[in-house]
Amino acid sequence: MRLTLLLAALLGYIYCQETFVGDQVLEIIPSHEEQIRTLLQLEAEEHLELDFWKSPTIPGETVHVRVPFASIQAVKVFLESQGIDYSIMIEDVQVLLDQEREEMLFNQQRERGGNFNFEAYHTLEEIYQEMDNLVAENPGLVSKVNLGSSFENRPMNVLKFSTGGDKPAIWLDAGIHAREWVTQATALWTANKIASDYGTDPAITSLLNTLDIFLLPVTNPDGYVFSQTTNRMWRKTRSKRSGSGCVGVDPNRNWDANFGGPGASSSPCSDSYHGPKPNSEVEVKSIVDFIKSHGKVKAFITLHSYSQLLMFPYGYKCTKPDDFNELDEVAQKAAQALKRLHGTSYKVGPICSVIYQASGGSIDWAYDLGIKYSFAFELRDTAFYGFLLPAKQILPTAEETWLGLKTIMEHVRDHPY
């Protein structure tokens, strides 16, 4: 066992230059507003290099923060001095990363000459190869649309599911934040589900006889590759700009939806950096241009992780959208359908009230463009693993998410506008 762990650690060093040995994820539940303000001040202390996986919002809501080993004692002493209770959610982040890397390498060996394993995490190259396989195996149903290239010149490939004709469309994307690996895996499983079950599953057949589906499994390909090869905790794009040594923009703060407002940072080194202007990121602009040119997209759905949430506009402001009642009803039904499979509970509501105010988000942009059915999923889990969800949870996550997606898609089909 010791040799196995040593090998895994060595492989982690080779494949992922930045290690997180001794880093801990703390769970904090602030009890009042003063503690919220204190945690927000702590978040602003850049020298501590804290990574807030779940930021402070309101009293009683859980906060998760990854604390580098070098800052652990200082942070714990500070929390105790302020009377803020905490517990350790992840004892050593690197242990989970080593296990994750070992599982990926084992799966790569197992897949050689065999079938694609949808219950494993994959490289970008492997994902793109499987997308090509789906197109080749389903020529009358699935095609590949290239939106262009990422900042580092990787293709942005979309799968189009269509039975022909000029139909209204549903847009579904995943992986806009690089480190949220379960979203890319869920999207690819969903693509296979749609392709495999058309013609035999009445629900999928009915949907595709009425609607086209455009699915982008990896919205941020550069960030995804970087998260696998260099820094597992990477969130942003990989764009570079003169005058700053910090790399990347938060692509879900870069849309033209109250750009630069609350919940987005003007600091290029922040994980929530909104970028120099709306749509500055080629990955965002490519989607914007495609959606606008298509002209008949009726639903815009994006997959994130984690926290088990199903949200709709608005994020950039805390007022209800005009279609609040309908969006809330659809989301509640989708969450109920999802829960029936494995008992996974989702919280439902507008972004601003469910998590926090955040400007420049994709579904706010889509809704303001006139795409009424705009939703964001935050997939599993709520604690324990955070962004490092074990591969064994990919399948149940994808299966239950599909039930929520299907509920939304059926509503879109039955309520044309």
From Swiss-Prot:
- What is this protein for, i.e. what is its function? Carboxypeptidase that catalyzes the release of a C-terminal amino acid, with a preference for large aromatic C-terminal residues.
Q: Which residues bind substrate?
A: 177-180, 235, 252-253, 305-306, 356
Can you name a GO cellular component term? extracellular region
Q: Which source organism? A: Rattus norvegicus
Which InterPro entries does the entry link to?
CPA_M14_CPD, M14A-like_propep, M14A_act_pep, Peptidase_M14
Where would one find the signal peptide in this protein?
A: 1-16
Where does this one sit in the cell? Secreted
What taxonomic ancestry is recorded? Answer: Eukaryota, Metazoa, Chordata, Craniata, Vertebrata
Residues of the propeptide region, as annotated, are: 17-112
Protein name as it appears in the record: Carboxypeptidase A2
